[in-house]
Amino acid sequence: MEPPQETNRPFSTLDNRSGQVQVLSATPLLQRNPYSSPDIMHIKGSEASSVPYALNQGTTALPKNKNQEGTGHRLLNMLRKTLKESDSEELEITQETPNLVPFGDVVGCLGIHIKNCRHFMPKISLQHYANLFIRISINKAVKCTKMCSLLSKNDEKNTVIKFDEVKYFSVQVPRRYDDKRNNILLELIQYDNREKRAFLLGSVQIHLYEVIQKGCFIEEVQVLHGNIFVCRLEVEFMFSYGNFGYGFSHQLKPLQKITEPSMFMNLAPPPERTDPVTKVITPQTVEYPAFLSPDLNVTVGTPAVQSSNQPSVVRLEKLQQQPRERLEKMKKEYRNLNTWIDKANYLESILMPKLEHKDSEETNIDEASENTKSNHPEEELENIVGVDIPLVNEEAETTANELLDNDSEKGLTIPTLNQSDQDNSTADASKNDESTPSPTEVHSLCTISNQETIKAGRIPPLGERQSESMPDRKMKNVFFPLEVKLKDNYPSILKADSSLSEVAFSPKEYNSPSFRPEYIEFKPKFQFQKFNKNGFDPFLRNINKMSVRKRKDQDIYKYRNILGAEVIEHEDQDPPYPAQSKTAGPANTTWAHDPNIFTTKMLETENKLAPDPTINTIKGLDTKNSLKENLPNVSLPSIKGESSRAGNVQANTCHLSKSLNFTPHIEYLKQSMILKSILSENLQDLSDKLFSKPEVSMNSEAREKSSSPLLSIHDKSSSSMEDNVLEKKQDLNNWLSEKDILNSKTTLSQIIKNIPADSFSEGSQIIENIPADSLLEGGQVIKNIPEYSLSEGGQIIKNIPADSFLESGPGQSPEVEEHVSKKHFEADERDFPIKKNSSTKKKHLISEVPNSKSGSSGTVHDYIMRQIFTAPIFSELEIEVKEPSETPMNLENQLPTPWKRSLSSHILFHEENADEIELPQPRSATSQIIQAFPIDTLLESGIIKVIELDKEHHKSSLLGTGITSPKGNLKDSQEYYSEIRSETEPLSEQSIPIIPKDTTSVSRAEFIQEDQNMFPQDSSYYSIANKELYLPRNGQRLCKDKNDLSSTLESLTNSLMDKLSESDEIMLKSFLKNIFNVFFKYNHSERRGQPEKELERLIQPSFTSDTEHLEELQEDFDKADKLDRKPILSPKLRVFLEELSESEVKHLKSELSKQIQHYLVERLSESGHITKEDLPKIYQNLYLMNEKAEQKGPNSFQGKYSETVKEIMSFVNNFNHHFIDKHLEIKLRSFLKEILQNYFLKNISESSLFNETASETIYPNISSLRTKSVSISFHELEQDISKGSFGRRFEINMKYPLSKSLQNYLIALSENELLHLKADLSKHLQSLFIEKLSKSGLMTKKQLEGINQHINLLNSSSIPLKYIKTHLPFRDDCHFVEKHSEKQNKYSRIVQQTTLQTVSEDKLREAELIREKEKKYFPLQNLKGNSSLIKEQKSYYTKEEAKTPSLIKVQPSSNENIQASPLSKSSEILTDILLKKLRKEHVFTQLPQAENSVHKTEIQDPYSWGGKSKITQSKAWCEKTLKMKSLDRKEHVNIYKWTVQEKPEAVLTSYPRIPNARMPREDEYLNRITFPSWQSSTLTHFNTETGEKSKLEDQYCQTLKGNNNNNKKHLVTFAQYKKEIQTLYIKPDEICSEKCAKFPEIQSFQYKVVEDEKNLKPHLFPELFKIEDLKPKVRKERDRVAQPKKSFNKIVRILPTTLPTTRIHLKKSVPRTLLHWTARRTIHDCSDKFEDLHDMTSFTHLKKVKSRSRLLGKSSDDIHNHARHSARPYTAPEVNKQRESYSGKFTSRRMVSSGLVHINDKTSDYEMHKMRPKKIKRGY
């Protein structure tokens, strides 16, 4: 849409431009201009604004150009140049430049200058005149103006709101006028500070085309709300082509004309910066921008070569400004994204937030309420935070307007985000620095963080917060854009802050317990991804990113309103979460301090926790932060006080929770759904990051992410520790005095009564976290803890407690810890007593661990963790650990939701994480990975169970079982297991984390961490031997992890299902699955990498015989596993293991062995037994050991195997070359793969692959076993395959066939063995294909029987047939057939090929002649045997369809067997080979004569597919042929081929319908001509049964055509042969179609045929040969054909004469094919159409074709065959007789299908012959 030149006129005038330039100069668009260098930017920015005036005022404006390098004089020169430059010069310049190449859509720069609003409707109240802004939406781009208020509110009529803002859009100009992208939407929106939401007052829509046509204009539009007038809006529109409005567009013509009217001023470049060629300004070097990370090494704008005369680097003020904190966070988020798609989405979400009016409005309201509440705390926080908050406020104030504009454009809510982030970081820093900040400070920080969190949750709230700091107006200005970006950026900030940032968010959520948790949930886990994923359309473009959070915020605000001032005050009181997150330790302490608040948050979060447990934790952290502030010095006693305090807080929280309860669960569910989707991505990313990071903290984070339920209790490093833990457990029980228990019960009961179940679960989580934090006096641990740990507040706490314990644990006496834990437990009990206890206990354990990790607390913690982790177990734990079991049960009922599992798991996991951080012994990747795995999963998998102490394994298995089992079962099992664990405390501690599988994952990770005290992994807890055991367990765990995860997911989902909708459950499941998959994959990769080698290396030095030792160890482990599994493995695990196939078990074992090796190596290295320098050697040794182990036993085996594998691989590769049909190739490949896999798997299983993997020494045995069981296994495989029962074992072990051992085995196989294998495979394939066909309904029982007979015949006569085939080097056809046969039967094919190759052509010809004679007799015999059938077919011709199947079945009996083999692949190949041989014999026999060769080729085509039918028809023909001596052989050949064709036809119908389809075509040609009834029946049969196959064949033929366009002859032969060989192939149909297409073009076809005959006489000869049979002239003609056109014409003449007789027969059969071919005269058309017809129900098509062919028989055929052709058929009656025999042959199914035969009774026959040559040509 190129606007008229007028459009550009306004811009051409400086006056017009001047005004616009001013506006444009400040716009970011200018800065973005790719063409603009820093200089240009300055010129356009500072200069541009002044230039317009400079033009009018002279040089007065020049001084304003401060950024300009030159002086005012320089600018004047530039302006003069620009103004004085003549058009001619411009023209010359433009002529010099090459024309732009059109590319992409037309683009342009649209400038919209929003001037003012006036003439407001009187009805509008004055209140609506405040905080108004215009939102401009074009396509997906959304930009907002600053917020403005009415200048005059006294006189409504004269009220004017001046915006005076210009927004630029780079727009694509759609080609269609009605394209919705052409709509420019201007919306007048008012932001309500009180409600914190935006309201749409009115809107107006303008069409882009109008703007383009007018170019530049000012228009006053009416803003309407529906049909109600609101006001008048004065807008100036400017449009200029080119992305940046410079008139450059690849679709606009003269450059000079385009540049003239640029939207921006055109200034002549300074002489020193003018390019001499293009006369454009050269780029200017700019200093490296401060906002770009130095590591990026950005070179854009820097000259490649510094020239001496180049000016110094330009310093731009803007570029020197340090980036805001948000930018760094965003960078981190961006860099953390793994895929370009994610990165693009992330950037798009920032730059182009989606519109979501309602959400943004709601969010705004919520934010406003929160902001008002938290204004003072925010201010305090800002003060505490220091620079950050003030910075944000100042920026908001100073840049409120600009930033809003820029932010809205650029998504710059950085100030707000910075504020929250900075606040968080500052607060954290201050808290950490102060360790015990004054309560006031802490409180203020906490409050601010909460407010910020809330704001972040609703991105607008952040803006609000800023706005609160600054005037409301500014806040309004910033609010929308900030809100949008805050949402997106805030999560990123949180991520950047890691745990702190997450914590910060949770406080915000905590501020509005129910609401905050919801959006917090989104933020903590998806801080960054959240806005990427949640590209919700905020009310404003900036608000767009707020969508999810805004919704939550809105909901939260609503809920807050419901909650009332008390709840709001409580939230406000919470320390700002961001600050707390930074002061992780204090936040935790605060949590411990305010359990009530936590409970409230938890309640809210619980509802939201189901979606995002992390949010709950975060809230807890906020509370902890506030508590820490209150209790700067968190001592155990203080913690106790805090816990009691928390109880008080809980009371408040209960109120909040009540109010939260008011919030509809539907809202929670919705939020949870959003959270789930976000969390799934975030967790995946986090898990990836965690897995990638070897740090323990990362592991804990990863565990948290992978599954917050990963409550892995760290096993104490010593059994004594376990004893201590057990003692502690008892002590904890003792600690929980009856009074405490009663108190906790009462508190819990009250809380439960007051607080919703969800809030309860949340509270428990928070409480758990609080005790941990309180235990961690420093709260610094939180700082150290990664975001991931923060993602789950509990996780952060985990990390913190570990540090705190490490820091204060040694000093703290176990009693104090016990006391504290007791109090915490009570406090937690109030929220969720058991959880609190578990967290406290855990922390105590951690603290004690430094002291000696008294087992009692650890045990108690583990026990509690187990209970908590198992949602149902939670209540049990409470019952067991706490008297208030009823309350826990209530909580459990509430917790069963994802919140429950995730909360408990998170709490425990976090605490354990703290322990893990405290004891980050497992530095190795393997140990970390193992730690990351859920203990339950490990135990269930048997990795930990076997490896760890028997008790521990038993416990863990029990725990795992409990987790796996339903909730009730879990409770019972967990109780039982917890008891067992308490008994086997150390082990139980490790295995205690049995909670839901998510929880289990966490527990496992934690367990590893605790183990780290002893060993990085669970096995580390044990001695090195134990470690070795552990490694196998790890392998098992890895293998079983998924199963465990699935069971865990199921249990989790079961618990969640209560509260979550199906969609939520599904989302959670997928999320957990993704997390676990990523986690386990990572673990697998890490563990598999070097651990095995390391272990083996370790074993080698440590043991005399490393391999033997490993084997022994593995055997011992296996025994131990067997012994331990029964008692240790949970029932589900046992069932799972029992269900595992041997191969799967072996896989598991091998993985375990590798894991054990890796683990042992790591453990040894960690324990100092092995030095880092030794590790590489050890790994190498292990690797060598594995290799040796594989080679020792299986040396010969491997050699044979490798040979076999190589053979197979070469065979498969050959498949690719020869299989033109991709479908067939894929099927064959998969089939072979299955067979090989089954075979090898069986052999491998017999040879104990498991041991092989575990101790590579097994390989020798395996090799022998494999060798022994090769034949047997193959037979079994064949049976299985034929039965179609490959079993999942087969699928699971798909890798085995490709394993080195398999390859070695194959390589080692002798040729004989390989041949046997191949033969078995071929037979297998044949039977399998047949069975599959029959099962799939492609083959009828009769056909199947016939095929079976054929297969039997092939098997019996496969050798001679193969021998004949070997002889048949039918150029392309034979070669292809041979190749194909090779694919199907490598051995037979290879032998045949070699034979064929070895035999010289003369010998081949002689052999062919002999074979021809034999075949003549043989086919004749077959025909005799089937003669009745053939005759019957003729007689049944009317019943074509019915009889054809029978005939096909009967005829195939002998020949079909051959084709049956091809169907079974090997037999098919044999059949093809035989057919080829026969064809070759015929062809070779006739090759000397052109006619003979042509005839033979023709025969071959039908012979390959239609040849069988030809043979069948050739009984009578044989007689006729015998009558004609010259044609005798040919006739025999034809007959034989016909028979062959019929066989393939039967075969095709039975199995490869596609080949049948092709077969029917040739056969139809032959049959319809000579034996129309039989042929037609065959065709009908084919069409009915092989309609689908015919389609495939057509496709295949097309493929062949495309592949072999250069060898049409070869293609015909090849296609025919392939059709015969590959009943599955589509070529036959295609060939037929090709032939049919050729028929219409008889002359061209004749030429082609002649050429084909020359090139491939055998291929083309079949039809020519038929002609020869018709007359000796045909032979001469064919000889001539070898001469080209003359002979062909003669042949054509002869063909018509012979065709008439067959025509009559063909009429019946031809009609179907005729329709197909009649419509398609061109070869391509015919083939395509024919294929299409075949694609359709072939039977119906046949009928239609019949009718058409009968109608066309006289006319259509003539049309196809041309007049002369139609005449010739009538002219040669004698030939017609011959034609009948030959035409019958000639009218192969292909011809019939192509409809060539039945064009006309006489003419159609003649035409059929003509078309047939064409067909051959086409079939090439």
UniProtKB/Swiss-Prot annotation:
Residues 360-383, 403-443, 695-722, 838-857 are annotated as: Disordered. Disulfide bonds: none annotated. One of its GO terms (biological process) is spermatogenesis. The keyword Membrane applies. It is found in: Cell projection, Cilium, Flagellum membrane. One of its GO terms (cellular component) is sperm principal piece. Signal peptide: none annotated. Residues 415-443 have a biased composition (Polar residues). Expressed in testis (at protein level). Component of the CatSper complex or CatSpermasome composed of the core pore-forming members CATSPER1, CATSPER2, CATSPER3 and CATSPER4 as well as auxiliary members CATSPERB, CATSPERG, CATSPERD, CATSPERE, CATSPERZ, C2CD6/CATSPERT, TMEM249, TMEM262 and EFCAB9. HSPA1 may be an additional auxiliary complex member. The core complex members CATSPER1, CATSPER2, CATSPER3 and CATSPER4 form a heterotetrameric channel. This is Cation channel sperm-associated targeting subunit tau. It comes from Homo sapiens. The lineage of its organism: Eukaryota, Metazoa, Chordata, Craniata, Vertebrata. The gene is C2CD6.
